Amino acid sequence: MTEYILLIISTALINNFVLVKFLGLCPFMGVSKKIETAIGMSLATMFVLTVASISAYLIDTYILTPLSATFLRTLVFILVIAVVVQFTEMVINKTSPTLYRLLGIFLPLITTNCAVLGVALLNINQAHTLTQSVIYGFGASLGFGLVLVLFAALRERLAAADVPHVFKGASIALITAGLMSLAFMGFTGLVR
């Protein structure tokens, strides 16, 4: 049990996919202007990352490896992620049309979110078990959601702040993301 908790902490805080591995930067910068949208995107990505981790593990273990077709991993994982995203999109459209409209183009873009594919491939490369794959995917999505919501809150405050004209928009957003990355470096010695 301790191993799984450490895996979640390590994935969410220490080896955060956005701030350390620089995966998932497109939705990080694109959906982080309002907290409501960031929360919705975080929840959608959390579901997709967790289900994609399970699916990728099962497909690799029971189909690709026995057939010696591991060279097809990336292509198959992209297809699996696309199916999971389409399912998620249908569920969000039925349950919350407002959130569906707010997420707009970024919801289908989860398919091409490199963090989702990165988690699936890293699970296989690190030889995780099914349970570890699920926890790794959940921890990665937890870290992604945490960073996305914190960044959205900071961007909302910056929108109301008196920022010099030169730094308005993407400039101050990138500076803020860099400072967040430095802050998350403080978690480095947390897990040994």
From Swiss-Prot:
<comment type="function">
    <text>Part of a membrane-bound complex that couples electron transfer with translocation of ions across the membrane.</text>
</comment>
<dbReference type="InterPro" id="IPR003667">
    <property type="entry name" value="NqrDE/RnfAE"/>
</dbReference>
<feature type="transmembrane region" description="Helical">
    <location>
        <begin position="134"/>
        <end position="154"/>
    </location>
</feature>
<protein>
    <recommendedName>
        <fullName>Ion-translocating oxidoreductase complex subunit A</fullName>
        <ecNumber>7.-.-.-</ecNumber>
    </recommendedName>
</protein>
<comment type="subunit">
    <text>The complex is composed of six subunits: RnfA, RnfB, RnfC, RnfD, RnfE and RnfG.</text>
</comment>
<feature type="transmembrane region" description="Helical">
    <location>
        <begin position="171"/>
        <end position="191"/>
    </location>
</feature>
<keyword id="KW-1133">Transmembrane helix</keyword>
<feature type="transmembrane region" description="Helical">
    <location>
        <begin position="5"/>
        <end position="25"/>
    </location>
</feature>
<comment type="similarity">
    <text>Belongs to the NqrDE/RnfAE family.</text>
</comment>
<keyword id="KW-0997">Cell inner membrane</keyword>
<keyword id="KW-1278">Translocase</keyword>
<keyword id="KW-0249">Electron transport</keyword>
<keyword id="KW-0472">Membrane</keyword>
<keyword id="KW-1003">Cell membrane</keyword>
<dbReference type="GO" id="GO:0022900">
    <property type="term" value="P:electron transport chain"/>
</dbReference>
<feature type="transmembrane region" description="Helical">
    <location>
        <begin position="102"/>
        <end position="122"/>
    </location>
</feature>
<keyword id="KW-0813">Transport</keyword>
<dbReference type="Pfam" id="PF02508">
    <property type="entry name" value="Rnf-Nqr"/>
</dbReference>
<dbReference type="InterPro" id="IPR011293">
    <property type="entry name" value="Ion_transpt_RnfA/RsxA"/>
</dbReference>
<keyword id="KW-0812">Transmembrane</keyword>
<dbReference type="GO" id="GO:0005886">
    <property type="term" value="C:plasma membrane"/>
</dbReference>
<feature type="transmembrane region" description="Helical">
    <location>
        <begin position="63"/>
        <end position="83"/>
    </location>
</feature>
<dbReference type="InterPro" id="IPR050133">
    <property type="entry name" value="NqrDE/RnfAE_oxidrdctase"/>
</dbReference>
<feature type="transmembrane region" description="Helical">
    <location>
        <begin position="39"/>
        <end position="59"/>
    </location>
</feature>
